């Protein structure tokens, strides 16, 4: 799910609901909702996605703490994503939450009931505590991580904290 405009969040989620109507999950098919990332999804749409996840008892996942640019975007309202979104006139009424990525998700009610956090490349000790406390799950994408030259992933720190961590592949855009 992608839509950074809070004014169209309801329309976006209605399209999602239409798409899943009539799909009956079974042992071989499950449904999930995946708001993309904090720089492509408004806080309003994140909240609505979480509500849909809870209402329909479906998996919810998002890309989070993937890049230093994302951390800068949320914490200070500066950097690459601000420039990019301004180019598309998408930050009209947006104000930076002035929070780290994980604290941002927690602040909007996303971190609960086993949500899936994709990447988590840049985490503080407090954020790791929060991931553990909320029983959130982490997906580490090693090829994407290597492709973009990120710093060491906190994989073993997460594993040693008994945080559920899985390996993922991310998109073809970040794999050779």
For the regions a language model picked out, list residue spans one by one.
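Metal-coordinating catalytic core of metallo-dependent amide/deamination hydrolases
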Residues: 1-115
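Active-site-adjacent C-terminal substructures of enzyme catalytic domains
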Residues: 38-41, 107-176
